[in-house]
Amino acid sequence: MKKLIIASICVALGVVLSTTSIPVGPARIFPFQHMINVILAVIVGPRFSVGAACSTSCLRNVLALGSPLAFPGSMIGAWLSAYLYKKYNAIWAAALGEIIGTGLIGALVSYPIANFLLGKPLALLTLITSFSMSSVAGACIGFVVLQILSRRHLLHKEA
């Protein structure tokens, strides 16, 4: 029940923060879902982390705050983040899982979806770049948050 409550709070936080972007050169990145994926991977594990990513993507799409590309990216990133954290028991592994899962694998899976939705071919490198910029920034923020919580002995990790 505790994990469900934590995941639910993070879903609400993810929906609210999805309206916030950070300008990086000519682009705008949206790193907060990635931050939440890393934090949930460590705190609640893979099932609740992926469930929260899916729930956040659903709500963002229903509220017109996101795109269908959010599903594969966030869910793959959440799963790989939690998987690598469980395997290596290290916060850096969770951050790396989010970057690889969303930035690379999520972008590759989203490529045919993006082409279908746009009705014209899109450069794969464009998706990888945009997904990677957001996931690297979010994974770094999540890593820092988890390090601070850990150093203050406030982090209760998934067993």
Feature annotation, model-predicted:
Residues 1-159:
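Loop-helix junctions at membrane interfaces
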